[in-house]
Amino acid sequence: MSVTMREMLEAGVHFGHQTRFWNPKMAPFIFGHRNKIHIINLEKSLPMFQEAQKFAKQLTANRGTILMVGTKRQARELLAAEAQRAGVPYVDQRWLGGMLTNFKTVKTSIKRLKDMKAQQEAGLESMSKKEQLTFTREIEKLEKDIGGIQDMNALPDAIFIIDVGFHKIAVAEAKKLGIPLIGVVDSNHSPEGIDYVIPGNDDSAKAVALYARGIADAIIEGRANAVNDVVKAAAPEGSDEFVEVEESAA
């Protein structure tokens, strides 16, 4: 789960935006500038990223759900792959307005998608070719819009966002509902309202991969801890001796 300073350097996490586009509220996290590009202070970014990982791990250990969001071109595939690896919901194409604040309607769309997929698996022979084409196109659209959240039965307990400025609608919805935010904040955006700020480059594919992998690792580790706690709670007295017998039998 641990991320090192060297990994951050190699991923280009320290490269911010052009100095003329900076947000003064990011001043505490900026080391300086080079060739009119702000340099983000990794001595601050690293512990803040680790704090975000710790939060993600603890939340998941307590059976909380984290929604991962990254719809920028360079983030889509990377984020979707890591979310799938961690077994959590994700949004990788576009954020639909009301995805959180109007979740009741979104759940209706999710049910529609699941029903249509079940119908597709059963066979569409009773439909005309034109009807099949229309049906398939609707499924494809629903998959693109909400496929990553089709197993999310309730609002998430936290949201991880790559580029809070690009996803300002998602940020606003989360804040309105009081859902904690883990956010990658570049030098041109404001960290205000983000519960766990990760100051860093939000454009580099390598940096995006690092953030997504780090949070996914924390989620997986947290879930493993939750499973271990359940096993320990269910184990009868004298279970240590029982485990030793199992090991010797193996």
From Swiss-Prot:
Domain of life: Bacteria
SUPFAM superfamilies listed in its UniProt record: Ribosomal protein S2
GO molecular function: structural constituent of ribosome
Record has Ribosomal protein as a keyword: yes
InterPro entries assigned to the protein according to its UniProt record, in alphabetical order: Ribosomal_uS2, Ribosomal_uS2_bac/mit/plastid, Ribosomal_uS2_CS, Ribosomal_uS2_flav_dom_sf
CDD domains xrefs: RPS2 (cd01425)
GO cellular component: cytosolic small ribosomal subunit
Gene3D superfamilies per record: Glucose-6-phosphate isomerase like protein, domain 1, Helix hairpin bin
PROSITE patterns on file: RIBOSOMAL_S2_1
One example of a Gene Ontology biological process annotation: translation
UniProt KW keywords: Ribonucleoprotein, Ribosomal protein
HAMAP family, per database record: Ribosomal_uS2_B (MF_00291_B)
Assigned protein family: Belongs to the universal ribosomal protein uS2 family.
PANTHER family: 30S RIBOSOMAL PROTEIN S2 PROKARYOTIC AND ORGANELLAR, SMALL RIBOSOMAL SUBUNIT PROTEIN US2M
Name the UniProt record assigns to this protein: Small ribosomal subunit protein uS2
Organism listed in the record: Paracidovorax citrulli (strain AAC00-1) (Acidovorax citrulli)
